Amino acid sequence: MLFRSYRRIGDKVIQQANTTLNWSSTNSDAASLGSLGSVDTSGSKSVTLSPTQTANGPVDEELKYTLNATNVCGGSDSKTVSVRVKGSIEPVPAVLLNSVFFPTDYPTKQYPALGLVRSQQETLTTLADGFKKYLEYDPDAKLSLSAYADERGPGKHNQTLSDLRAQRVKDFLVSQGIAAEKIDATAHGKENQLDKATVIELQTKDPNQPPETRVKNFKATWLAYNRRVDILLLPTNAASERFYPHNAADSQLLWQRPKPSRRAVESSSN
């Protein structure tokens, strides 16, 4: 029996099973070969082997092709060849898109690698793992980063700050095995701020509900939501969830209005 491999992710066949059928019949005037219909009494043909299974899971099917040959004297003969198709049908890999957040005034020009705290590194690691698998489904997929700063500070400073944030996220994703050319980055400075009504709406949907102290100090929470990098999956335009990590161990450092010390940020980033 012949064996061929097959793999499909979502609606895309990643590894197609193929084989070449060869046949020859003597003393015959006509022949047919299964679903291929009428064929010459001798010949060969390349066929694509598609399993009948459509559901996700392992694939292990035996496909049979029977050659029926006849002649004008009423004689007939048949021969069957079997091809076993083994592989898998898999769902489209999930890419968990969540925005990442930064402490006040980080990173800095002097310390451009500082400010991506552990909880946000974990968020990006999960995203990177999913995206690398997703590339098997769509090799042309890309990530688009949009970085922001809160409203405090001069416009030029915030433009630089958001650029540092975009670059830090890109560098981290590259360190996780994503090619740099797969990542576009745009820095918005303090433009396109989330307004307070939007932040209130986001908080109602956030599975990480804030403690009472942060509910009372809404101004600090609003500012914290605007110190972030959003992520878009292209070409689907699936956007990252803006869930603020209130339950993360380093959330206080992310949330506080004053700029935290370098030592505190280093301790939460390593």
Regions found by a protein language model. Give the residues of each.
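C-terminal edge beta-strand
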Residues: 77-86
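Short proline/glycine-enriched turn/loop motifs at strand-loop junctions of beta-rich domains
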Residues: 24-31
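Short, solvent-exposed beta-strand/turn patches at coil↔beta or beta↔helix junctions
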Residues: 11, 87-134, 151-156, 219, ...
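Periplasmic OmpA-like peptidoglycan-binding domain that tethers envelope proteins to the cell wall
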Residues: 142, 146-247, 251, 257-258, ...
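Periplasmic peptidoglycan-binding/anchoring modules of Gram-negative envelope and division proteins
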Residues: 17-22, 102, 107-147, 170, ...
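Solvent-exposed segments in extracellular or luminal domains encompassing
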Residues: 39-65
